[in-house]
């Protein structure tokens, strides 16, 4: 660390000299020598050190971190030694420019010639790093872009081009000279961005000097120069990096998308090939003769082909230029009389929409997936093929469009998230380094303190970076001495060579501006100086105080740099050090701080100069975040605080020399932080002084008193309330403007505007007086207000000069002032602000992409649009969408980004050829729309959190508006209470009721029928939020706490933006909590509390735990708890619906029952009929159930209760609901013609009504009114039954034809809603939706506010300008403005009645109409007509002219970006967020599990669901066995998959117009494949026998094979009546899913499919809900729009005449497609658009629509289906995708366990679940990664300590568990999980053989080793004895005297016997070598055999002979051991 503590200043930077280069070379040589040694070590298996990495904040092109200080001026632009230690062994040097940007260069020779010290290269480096150089290049590029955007450049621009080329050449030359060309790192071509420069220059010269024909195509490449901006601006590089990363991540999704689209395209090809060419052709007659000519309408054609290809003979669709398609199937479109359906001409849309070949089918499917103009394709296909094929489109839309497109979003979002995490990790890394540095400083500081050294006095001088060098030198010497001192224990000493690397002074620290980065994610970090705080949640607890901080937070500052060390009074001790802080010292500066304009906070009460300890001076002031807006100068609401140290105290420092010691590093850090603070300053000090002098007005006492009074008024909450009301009124006034206003109305609006302008000006003036300008302009809102006021005043001044409606638009910004008091709007604006901030670079990238493609389009296609315009435009004018000039090219690209690409692409393909257009358009679509826009959306979602949406204000206090409202409420409450008391006083003289009666009348509500205890959720409910209130005042006559009172639980009130602000000043939070806890304790202890106000009663206690009296026995009560009765007919109990947590626990039911023993009757009893209030007010409601009439009534109720609760009753009601809903579907336009059905339906309707009324009455009697009417689902039932009842009564009385009754009848369409509560799946979804409704409504409201601004602006711009004069005879085409100029001329010319003035149906004539227009623009449906009208508009009621107002397009572009893109996507954000919140509420273990635990839990979950399978036994027959071996090989499967894919390819080759030869060949190929697959099937059946049918895949194959054979045989019949039999072959593609498991590389795709599988159940529920919504709306549509005129989107097939047709229309607009076309005819109100008197089949008249009903119908449907339900679908996919990705990144996946069991089958063919210990090693080696343990693996397996059962067998669970543990690592949770798993496994496999381990692998090894040790020891012992005995015998034989047999060591026993034998046999003289090595020691076996009686070794202990064989006796070895 000593290295770290080098001083700052010049010594950090050393010039790069030849010596430096030599030093680097020396280090490189050393490293190489070390490297060879290291590689040797690694071969020996020693751990390698972690390789060093380049430091992130010292990377090239980053700014030098502040800690390194400022380089001296003379070193700027000069080569310096590299600061990053990573490059210490590489030939590099760095250069810094004035902006301290790092440039890194290679120190090798550039171009072999120029060394780093060559003057030419130095000059080039100086130029390159200079900021002016990059500015010059930037300006050149921008100028070049301007020139490129000219569509018809003048001739002189050629010379400008040469200039540009010269500048780019010069740039590249400088770079090459400075960096070198390409050989080494950091040279020119090593940077990919330079490749771009290089290619641009090469292209420029190539086009100039070589003639290459089509120059415009090559000129197009020049547009790539725009990309150079990215290489110049470093911020863009990172975003592009993120884009490239996300594109890489998209690979899997792209593969899956292409695969799915290919499958769907194949299906489309087979189903619809050639269908779209069927047209309605005029009838003709064939003329007799040989030439085949035909005649029609008296005209003769040469041949039938010529006739069929003549467009004049086709019938056109009504009101369009499209040909009417038709089909030959029964439900396809039909032709009118005089026409027949024939295959003729080309396909629709210039021939580009078709399924005639695979390529066109694929394009059609891609278009379907991106949902561009898909309704057109849908209508064309259904008209030509039949309505049944709606199913195909549903599949493609739901699987393709919703799933795949959103997967792309999910992947891009995840890539962004990962990058974000990486940024956070990088900052954490820096922080860690910083912490290490701080530890070091602390140690040094403590060391100095112990020595008694003054550690502070340095700071004054040496905090300055200009401290003299001599000081630095002296300090570094001193530090060297210090760091080798005893206190540090030598731990921090570094090798000498390190301290010599001077330039790398602060390497270990490398702290950047990361300090103040606010974009980080919040996270808790102890001792962190990096504040990870969400931008929008200011926290007051930066320095903890008791009031608003937790212990954890204050603790987190313990080691923080920014908190002063505890203060100490100097009087106690002169010696500086750490001690206790001064008593009562305030650390949190909330109450006593001021903020200056720089955001620096001074603590006013932070102690005086004497009270400051040395510690507090280590740091100068630093602010990490700017303080938020302050309301008053003296008050600083929650925000980051900061302490300003006082002047240093010099007392107590005796040693003069101490002033020059230590803390150099502290000065480094301090000055770095000081610089950081300076960088945050908003204004320089001189401005600061000026502002404080002139902008704070405190002149005289009179002024001050006026100021105080004004302040009192202005700052009062009521002033805010008044201003807010004025804003709302002003907005209302602006919204009242409309077309055709009367003069009086207009004048009123103008006066209103003047008044409001006056009010807002006055507000601003008074606020400036009250606050002084200095403080007024420190608040963002005030600045905003002042700007708007100034603009309003400007507008007043300028309005006389002309119509400046643009300035009027600025008034609209006042609406945003609402955000101040409306948190949701505020949050939303912040979200958009944050996103736009974060999106700055991304927006720039998008702009560059749009620019590039616009220029490319203009260069490539521009000319073609003008030359070949006749192909796409009948009028001869240029079409609206063309690429002739840059603006129009930009519009086309923007339109593609909006998702509309296909129509403009058709035009392009017509004029410019197919290939190039396809390439450009699809590139823009994929890059721009799918990637960049999804990245936008990902950023938007990431800055979104609904916690903020519902949170109150940031500082946790109420804002002024809420205070004002609370005051008003308090006033009203006071008035109410006073009035109440007064009335009670008057009534008090009445005699009281007897107490007994009062008590009795109160009993029934809660206690009269004792209930079973509440469910666990209620019992364990968390304490309610602080919104819960208890009324303090008691109402008279409510009894006392001693009375028998009901236990009632208040429900937590729902949150809203302006909540009931009852926590007023008089009722503080503390007392409130005391009160509630007191009441809670009363309840729990069995006491009773007074009843609350009715609205606070809990439905929980009344319903959930009700359903009658519980029995006295505790056991029964327990049973009741487990199976609680519920009212299924009414759906969910309110406990689910309303209450999240109740405040009080229920009293113990057993105690209650003891109190009232006589009521413990049957549990299945109903509740009371009436609420307690009713009983109290009407005692007659109280029935005595013990007497005769009451008893009968009670029995009746019990009977009804049993009926209603019976499951059969519920089933019957569901059946009736479905029947009645189904009956509604028959009430269509043809009902009058079908008399029988009509009569049947009438009777059925009556029957249903009676049944439902009966059900309702039964439920009333059974449940009582109280329970029935406190349940939302029951209310729904009640209302729907009422509608049926009223319509039935009206029918009976003959009022059926009355208008109101008719409209009431349409409400019967709501009947299916009753099914909601009965179907669990739908109810779950609805509950989730209901939970999200508050947030959704919030966002909807905010969207409406946003849109209001655009709508008012639209009214200002376009009101009255959308009209035009039309000539009816010319087919509704507007006349030229030269003929008719305006509305009055049109009316005056209208003599014949053929001219009339009309308006575009959707216009901006008022704000309401504007909203509808904006909805069409935002959903991109019908927006073209609106835009065209706006662009063509000239003036008020003037005839439009083609593109007269061209730049009005910009209004729509801006609206689409802010109004559509941001606001509509917020819906996804809100819904996802709500899902997550609800998950948190419901989520159990997920939230309480650590990441580690989750990992184990998931692995175990997968593991437990598997068990070993018995493999299919191999046949005994030799041939069958051979086939079996082939069939079961993986290669066989892969081969079959390959053949399937090949089969698909042959299917792709088919086209509609193929030749007979091709048809023949393909048929034969098909037969071949059918034969192959049939063969496969037969072979498998032969090999696998009856086991073949045990596998579902095999059954699937079998069915497909049978179908293929049938299809081939009966192809003609099937094709004629059904569809092409080749479709069966497509089904076979499903088998590809099977092979994905085998391919390791397909893991990503498996994850995606897994995400889909996980989503399916939820998606099914959402689909059901969507179907229900569609059903209801289609019934409404049939009732209201059946007879609407056919035009636009409504025709003979797509209409509301029948249920089926309505469903077709509604499915189409579920994705919002074509809803404008369906709405258009409904907006017709009278002639000439429709005929109000046309008679209809049901007796009504007219084919006009009803605009109000139509608009309501379509807008609500779009909001419900498109914005909510479809977004729920998206939310689920995103959620499951992240879950699936998590699963796939887990170390062990499902596949790994599958693989384990597959291998297991081979080792355990009988599925005994055990394998032999001997086989374990092979088994472990046979597995695949990550479970595999490769051989040699004996030791690893032994260490696993696996339990073994008798017979040396090991259980599969034990093995799997051990292997899993090895992969996941050790963890404390493993044991608990193991027990769980074993229990689970036992339960799943009851047949398991008794499992009692007798030993383990480790114990077995221990035993073996022990045995070996014992053997060896015994052998050695024997050997020693033998040697002794041999020695004795030898000596004896040699004739030593005195040796008798008695002296022998071994007189008897085996050794003596054998030795004596040996020696006695010898005849010759004994030599030393004659002792046979085999003769002794005796073998172990013989010893044990002979002496088994007397030796304590049992052979049975070593059960296996191998153990002994392992260790053969080796005398040599033993001899050595003795020696």
Swiss-Prot record:
Where is it predominantly found? membrane
Which cell locations does it reside in? Cell membrane; Cytoplasm, Perinuclear region; Cell membrane, Sarcolemma, T-tubule; Cell junction
Q: Repeats (IV): which ranges?
A: 1512-1809
Sorted alphabetically, the keyword list is: Calmodulin-binding, Cell junction, Cell membrane, Cytoplasm, Disulfide bond, Glycoprotein, Ion channel, Ion transport, Membrane, Methylation, Phosphoprotein, Repeat, Sodium, Sodium channel, Sodium transport, Transmembrane, Transmembrane helix, Transport, Ubl conjugation, Voltage-gated channel
Single GO molecular function: voltage-gated sodium channel activity
Q: Where are the II repeats?
A: 699-971
**TM stretches of this protein:** 130-149, 158-179, 189-209, 217-236, 250-272, 387-413, 720-737, 747-769, 776-796, 807-821, 839-860, 915-943, 1206-1227, 1239-1261, 1271-1293, 1300-1319, 1333-1357, 1448-1472, 1531-1549, 1561-1582, 1592-1614, 1622-1642, 1653-1681, 1748-1773
What does the entry's PTM section describe? Phosphorylation at Ser-1505 by PKC in a highly conserved cytoplasmic loop slows inactivation of the sodium channel and reduces peak sodium currents. Regulated through phosphorylation by CaMK2D.
Instruction: Report which reactions are catalysed by this protein.
Output: Na(+)(in) = Na(+)(out)
Q: Where is the composition biased (Polar residues)?
A: 507-528
* Compositionally skewed regions (Basic and acidic residues) per UniProt: 41-52, 491-503, 1017-1036
Known Gene3D superfamilies for this protein?
A: 1.10.287.70, EF-hand, iswi atpase, Voltage-gated potassium channels. Chain C
Q: Which cysteines are joined by disulfide bonds?
A: 280-335, 908-917
Q: Which residues carry this modification: Dimethylated arginine?
A: 526
- Keyword field contains Transferase: no
Q: Specify residue ranges for compositional bias: Acidic residues.
A: 1056-1075
Positions with biased composition (Low complexity): 1098-1115, 1963-1982
Q: On the Cytoplasmic side, which residues? A: 1-129, 180-188, 237-249, 414-719, 770-775, 822-838, 944-1205, 1262-1270, 1320-1332, 1473-1530, 1583-1591, 1643-1652, 1774-2019
Boundaries of each IQ domain copy?
1903-1932
What's the domain remark here?
The sequence contains 4 internal repeats, each with 5 hydrophobic segments (S1, S2, S3, S5, S6) and one positively charged segment (S4). Segments S4 are probably the voltage-sensors and are characterized by a series of positively charged amino acids at every third position. The IQ domain mediates association with calmodulin.
Which protein is depicted? Sodium channel protein type 5 subunit alpha
Naturally occurring in which organism (per UniProt): Mus musculus
The gene coding this protein: Scn5a
């Amino acid at each position: 660390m000593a290295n770290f503590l080098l001083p700052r200043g010049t010594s950090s930077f050393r010039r790069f000299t030849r010596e430096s280069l030599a030093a680097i070379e020396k280090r490189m040589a050393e490293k190489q020598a070390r490297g060879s040694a290291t590689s040797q070590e690694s071969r020996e298996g020693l751990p390698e050190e972690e390789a060093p990495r380049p430091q992130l904040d010292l990377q090239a092109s980053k700014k030098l971190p502040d800690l390194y200080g400022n380089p001296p001026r003379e070193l700027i632009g000069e080569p310096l030694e590299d600061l990053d230690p990573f490059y210490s062994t590489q030939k590099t040097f760095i250069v810094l420019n004035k902006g301290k940007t790092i440039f890194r260069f290679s120190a090798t020779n550039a171009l072999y010639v120029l060394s780093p010290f060559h003057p030419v290269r130095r000059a080039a480096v100086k130029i390159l790093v200079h900021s002016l150089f990059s500015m010059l290049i930037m300006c050149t590029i921008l100028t070049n872009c301007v020139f490129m955007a000219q569509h018809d450049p003048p001739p002189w621009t050629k010379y400008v081009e040469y200039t540009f080329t010269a500048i780019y050449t010069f740039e590249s030359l400088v770079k090459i000279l400075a960096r070198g060309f390409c050989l080494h790192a950091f040279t020119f071509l090593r940077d990919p961005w330079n490749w771009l420069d290089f290619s641009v220059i090469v292209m420029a010269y190539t086009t100039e000097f070589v003639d290459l024909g089509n120059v415009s195509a090559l000129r197009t490449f020049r547009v790539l120069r725009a990309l150079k901006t990215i290489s110049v601006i470093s911020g863009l590089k990172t975003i592009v990096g993120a884009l490239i990363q996300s594109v890489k991540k998209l690979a899997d999704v792209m593969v899956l998308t292409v695969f799915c689209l290919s499958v769907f395209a194949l299906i489309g090809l087979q189903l619809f090939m050639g269908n779209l060419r069927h047209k309605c052709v005029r009838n003709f007659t064939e003329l007799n003769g040989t030439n085949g000519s035909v005649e029609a309408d008296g005209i003769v054609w040469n041949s039938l082909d010529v006739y069929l290809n003549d467009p004049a003979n086709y019938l056109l669709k009504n009101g369009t230029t499209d040909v009417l398609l038709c089909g030959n199937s029964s439900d396809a479109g039909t032709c009118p009389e005089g026409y027949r359906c024939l295959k003729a001409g080309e396909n629709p849309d210039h021939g580009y929409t078709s399924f005639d070949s695979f390529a066109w089918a694929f394009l059609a499917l891609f278009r379907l997936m991106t949902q561009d103009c898909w309704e057109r394709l849908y209508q064309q296909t259904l008209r030509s093929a039949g309505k049944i094929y709606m199913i195909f489109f549903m599949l493609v839309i739901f699987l393709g469009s919703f799933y795949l497109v959103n997967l792309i979003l999910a992947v891009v979002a995840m890539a962004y998230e990962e990058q974000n995490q990486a940024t956070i990790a990088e900052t954490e890394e820096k922080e860690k380094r910083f912490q290490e540095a701080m530890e070091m400083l602390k140690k040094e500081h403590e060391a100095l303190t112990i020595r008694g050294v003054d550690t502070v006095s340095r700071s004054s001088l040496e905090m300055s970076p200009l401290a003299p060098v001599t000081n630095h030198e002296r300090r570094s010497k001193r530090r060297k001495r210090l760091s080798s001192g005893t206190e540090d224990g030598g731990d921090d000493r570094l090798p000498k060579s390190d301290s010599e690397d001077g330039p790398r002074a602060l390497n270990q620290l490398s702290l950047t501006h990361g300090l103040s980065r606010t974009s980080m994610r919040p996270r808790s970090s102890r001792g962190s100086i990096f504040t990870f705080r969400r931008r929008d949640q200011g926290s007051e607890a930066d320095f903890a105080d008791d009031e608003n901080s937790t212990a954890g937070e204050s603790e987190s500052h313990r080691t923080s740099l920014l908190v002063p060390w505890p203060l100490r009074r100097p009087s106690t001790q002169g010696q500086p050090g750490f001690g206790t802080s001064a008593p009562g010292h305030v650390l949190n500066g909330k109450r006593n701080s001021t903020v200056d304009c720089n955001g620096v906070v001074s603590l006013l009460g932070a102690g005086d100069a004497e009270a400051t300890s040395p510690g507090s001076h280590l740091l100068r002031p630093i602010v990490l975040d700017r303080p938020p807006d302050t309301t008053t100068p003296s008050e600083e609401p929650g925000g980051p605080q900061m302490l300003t140290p006082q002047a240093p105290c010099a007392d107590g420092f005796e040693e003069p020399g101490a002033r020059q010691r230590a803390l150099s590093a502290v000065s480094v850090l301090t000055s770095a932080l000081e610089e950081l603070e300076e960088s945050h300053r908003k204004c320089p000090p001189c401005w600061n002084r000026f502002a404080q002098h002139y902008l704070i007005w405190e002149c005289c006492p009179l002024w001050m008193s006026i100021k105080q009074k004004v302040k009192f008024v202005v700052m009062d909450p009521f002033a805010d309330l008044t201003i807010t009301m004025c804003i709302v009124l002003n907005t209302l006034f602006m919204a009242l403007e409309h077309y055709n206003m009367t003069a009086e109305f207009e004048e009123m609006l103008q006066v209103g505007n003047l008044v409001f302008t006056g009010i807002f000006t006055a507000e601003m003036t008074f606020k400036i007086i009250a606050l002084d300008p200095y403080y007024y302009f420190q608040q963002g809102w005030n600045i905003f207000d002042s700007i708007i006021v100034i603009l309003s005043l400007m507008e007043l001044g300028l309005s006389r000069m002309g119509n400046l409606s643009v300035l009027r638009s600025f008034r609209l910004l006042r609406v945003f002032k609402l955000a101040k008091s409306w948190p949701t709007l505020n949050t939303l604006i912040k979200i958009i602000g944050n996103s736009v901030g974060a999106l700055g670079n991304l927006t720039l990238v998008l702009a560059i992409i749009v620019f590039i493609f616009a220029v490319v389009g203009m260069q490539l296609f521009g000319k073609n649009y003008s030359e070949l315009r006749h192909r796409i435009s009948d009028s001869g004018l240029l079409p609206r969408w063309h690429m002739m000039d840059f603006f129009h090219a930009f519009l086309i690209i923007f339109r593609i980004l909006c998702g509309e690409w296909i129509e403009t692409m058709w035009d392009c393909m017509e004029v410019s050829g197919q290939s190039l257009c396809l390439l450009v358009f699809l590139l823009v679509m994929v890059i721009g729309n799918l990637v960049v826009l999804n990245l936008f959306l990902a950023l938007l979602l990431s800055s979104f959190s609904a916690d903020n949406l519902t949170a109150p204000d940031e500082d946790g206090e109420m804002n002024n508006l809420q205070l004002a409202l609370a005051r008003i409420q308090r006033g009203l409450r006071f008035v109410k209470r006073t009035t109440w008391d007064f009335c009670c006083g008057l009534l008090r003289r009445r005699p009281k009721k007897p107490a007994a009666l009062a008590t009795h009348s109160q009993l029934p509500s809660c206690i009269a029928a004792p209930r079973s205890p509440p469910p666990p959720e209620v019992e364990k409910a968390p304490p309610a939020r602080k919104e819960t209130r208890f009324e303090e005042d008691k109402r008279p006559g409510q009894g006392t706490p001693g009375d028998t009172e009901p236990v009632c639980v208040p429900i937590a009130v729902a949150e809203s933006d302006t909540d009931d602000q009852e926590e007023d000043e008089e009722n503080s939070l503390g007392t409130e909590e005391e009160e509630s806890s007191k009441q809670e304790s009363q309840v729990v202890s069995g006491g009773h509390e007074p009843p609350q106000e009715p609205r606070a009663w809990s439905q929980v206690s009344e319903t959930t735990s009700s359903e009658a009296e519980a029995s006295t026995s505790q056991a029964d009560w327990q049973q009741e708890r487990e199976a609680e009765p519920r009212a299924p007919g009414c759906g969910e109990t309110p406990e689910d619906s309303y209450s999240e947590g109740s405040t009080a626990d229920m009293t113990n039911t057993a105690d209650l029952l003891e109190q009232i023993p006589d009521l413990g009757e049957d549990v299945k009893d109903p509740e009371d009929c009436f609420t307690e209030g009713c009983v109290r007010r009407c005692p007659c409601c109280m029935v005595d159930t013990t007497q005769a009439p009451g008893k009968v009534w009670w029995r009746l109720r019990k009977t009804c209760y049993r009926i209603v609760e019976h499951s059969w009753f519920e089933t019957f009601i569901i059946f009736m609901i479905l029947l009645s809903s189904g009956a509604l579907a028959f009430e269509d336009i043809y009902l009058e013609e079908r008399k029988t059905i009509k009569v049947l339906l009438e009777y059925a309707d009556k029957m249903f009504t009676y049944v439902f009324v009966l059900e309702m009455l039964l439920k009333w009697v059974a449940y009582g009114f109280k329970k029935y009417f406190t349940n939302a689902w029951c209310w729904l039932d009640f209302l729907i039954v009422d509608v049926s009842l009223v319509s039935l009564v009206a029918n009976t009385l003959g009022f059926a034809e009355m208008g109101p009754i008719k409209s009431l009848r349409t409400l019967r369409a709501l009947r299916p809603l009753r099914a909601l509560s009965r179907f669990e799946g739908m109810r779950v979804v609805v509950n989730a939706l209901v939970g999200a409704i508050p947030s959704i409504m919030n966002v909807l409201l905010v969207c409406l506010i946003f849109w209001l601004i655009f709508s008012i602006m639209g009214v200002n711009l376009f009101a009255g300008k959308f009209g035009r004069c039309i000539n009816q005879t010319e087919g509704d085409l507007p006349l030229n403005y030269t003929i008719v100029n305006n509305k009055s001329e049109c009316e005056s010319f209208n003599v014949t009645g053929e001219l009339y003035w009309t308006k575009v149906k959707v216009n901006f004539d008022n704000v309401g109409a504007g909203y509808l227009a904006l909805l069409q623009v935002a959903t991109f449906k019908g927006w073209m007509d609106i835009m065209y009208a706006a662009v063509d508009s000239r003036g008020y009621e003037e005839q439009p002219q083609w593109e007269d107002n061209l730049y009005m397009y910009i209004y729509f572009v801006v609206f689409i970006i802010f109004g559509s893109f941001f606001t509509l996507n917020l819906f996804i954000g809100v819904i996802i967020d709500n899902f997550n919140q609800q998950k948190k509420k419901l989520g159990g273990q997920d939230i309480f599990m650590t990441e580690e635990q989750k990992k184990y839990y998931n692995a175990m979950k997968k593991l437990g669901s598997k068990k070993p399978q018995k493999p299919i036994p191999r046949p005994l027959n030799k041939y069958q066995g051979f086939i079996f071996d082939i069939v079961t090989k993986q290669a066989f499967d892969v081969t079959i998959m390959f053949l399937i894919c090949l089969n698909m390819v042959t299917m792709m080759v088919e086209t509609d117009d193929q030749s007979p030869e091709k048809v023949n060949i393909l048929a034969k190929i098909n037969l071949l494949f059918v034969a192959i697959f049939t063969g496969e099937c037969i072979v498998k059946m032969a090999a696998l026998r009856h086991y073949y049918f045990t596998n579902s895949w095999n059954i699937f194959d079998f069915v497909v094979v049978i179908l293929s054979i049938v299809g081939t045989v009966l192809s003609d019949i099937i094709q004629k009546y059904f569809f092409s039999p080749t479709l069966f072959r497509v089904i076979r593609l499903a088998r590809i899913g099977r092979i994905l498991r085998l391919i390791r590389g397909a893991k990503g795709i498996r994850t995606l499919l897994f995400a889909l599988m996980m989503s399916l159940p939820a998606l099914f529920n959402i689909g059901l809900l969507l179907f229900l919504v569609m059903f209801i709306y289609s019934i409404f549509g049939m009732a209201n729009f059946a007879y609407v005129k056919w035009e636009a989107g409504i025709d003979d097939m797509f209409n509301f005449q029948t249920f089926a047709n309505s469903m077709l229309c509604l499915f189409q607009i579920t994705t919002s497609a074509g809803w404008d076309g369906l709405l258009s005819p409904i907006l017709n109100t009278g002639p000439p658009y429709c005929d109000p008197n046309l008679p209809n089949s049901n007796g009504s008249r007219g084919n006009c629509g009803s605009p109000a009903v139509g608009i309501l119908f379509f807008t609500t449907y779009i909001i419900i289906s498109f914005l909510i339900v479809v977004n729920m679908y998206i939310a689920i996919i995103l959620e499951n995708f992240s879950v699936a990705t998590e699963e796939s990144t887990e170390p062990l996946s499902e596949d790994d366990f599958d693989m384990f069991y597959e291998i297991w089958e081979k080792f355990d063919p009988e599925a005994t679940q055990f394998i032999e210990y001997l086989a374990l090693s092979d088994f472990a080696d046979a597995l695949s990664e990550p479970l595999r343990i490769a051989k040699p693996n004996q030791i690893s397996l032994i260490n696993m300590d696996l339990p073994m059962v008798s017979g040396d067998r090991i259980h599969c669970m034990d093995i799997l568990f051990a292997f899993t543990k090895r992969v996941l690592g050790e963890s404390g949770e493993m044991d608990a999980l193991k027990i769980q798993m074993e229990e689970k496994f036992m339960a799943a496999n009851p047949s398991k053989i008794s499992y009692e381990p007798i030993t383990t692998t480790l114990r077995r090894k221990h035993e073996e080793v022990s045995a070996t040790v014992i053997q060896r020891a015994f052998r050695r012992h024997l050997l020693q004895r033998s040697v002794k005995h041999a020695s004795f015998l030898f000596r004896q034989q040699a004739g030593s005297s005195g040796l008798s047999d008695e002296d022998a060591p071994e007189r008897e026993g085996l050794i003596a016997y054998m030795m004596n034998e040996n020696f006695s046999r010898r005849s010759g003289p004994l030599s030393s070598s004659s002792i046979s090595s085999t003769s002794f020691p005796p073998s172990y076996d013989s010893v044990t055999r002979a002496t088994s009686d007397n030796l304590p070794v049992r052979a049975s202990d070593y059960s296996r002979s191998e153990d002994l064989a392992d260790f053969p006796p080796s005398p040599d070895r033993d001899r050595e051991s003795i020696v």
